[in-house]
A protein has these predicted regions:
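A short, N-terminal "cap"/entry segment at the start of jelly-roll beta-barrel domains
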Residues: 1-35, 116-117
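Double-stranded beta-helix
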Residues: 3-6, 90, 94-117
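A short beta-loop-beta micro-motif enriched in histidine and acidic residues
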Residues: 31-37, 43-58, 75
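Short acidic (Asp/Glu) patches
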Residues: 44-46, 63-64, 84-87
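Glycine- and acidic-residue-biased ligand/ion/polar-headgroup-sensing regions
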Residues: 55-70
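Short acidic-glycine-tyrosine-enriched beta hairpin
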Residues: 71-88
């Protein structure tokens, strides 16, 4: 396995400021529900996340701001985005005013695997 690929999982954290080499400068996570796994992710202005995938199918609901996924498009409040488990994408970034996104893991725990699958 490529050593640049790492897996990160958060299950029991109510609120967490998440910092990592793949996240600049950080994002804030707030657990809404454990089952199904629903997190509110707050991106500061222009925050970026590197290429990654999730271990489960994931639905994004854009609540505020602008959420940009390289190779896809810019998402705005009310937009939905669906990603199948194991599909790598990104980088992704918030717009100039930041973004708030609900991330719903539809068939498993919330997690991130950095790099290409």
């Amino acid at each position: 396995m490529d050593e640049s690929i790492r897996t990160w999982t958060i299950e029991d954290v109510e609120n967490a400021r998440f910092e990592d080499d793949h996240v600049q400068p950080y994002v804030h996570l707030r657990r809404i529900s454990a089952d199904p796994a629903v997190r509110e992710v707050t991106f500061p202005p222009n925050a970026t996340l590197g290429v990654h995938s999730h271990p489960c199918d994931t639905l994004y609901v854009i609540r505020s701001g602008e959420f940009i996924v390289e190779g896809e498009r810019s998402y705005r409040p009310g937009d939905l985005r669906w990603v199948r488990a194991g599909v790598s994408y990104g980088p992704e970034r918030a717009g100039a005013d930041g973004a708030v996104v609900l991330v719903v893991s539809t068939n498993g725990p919330f997690g991130v695997r950095w790099g290409h699958a």
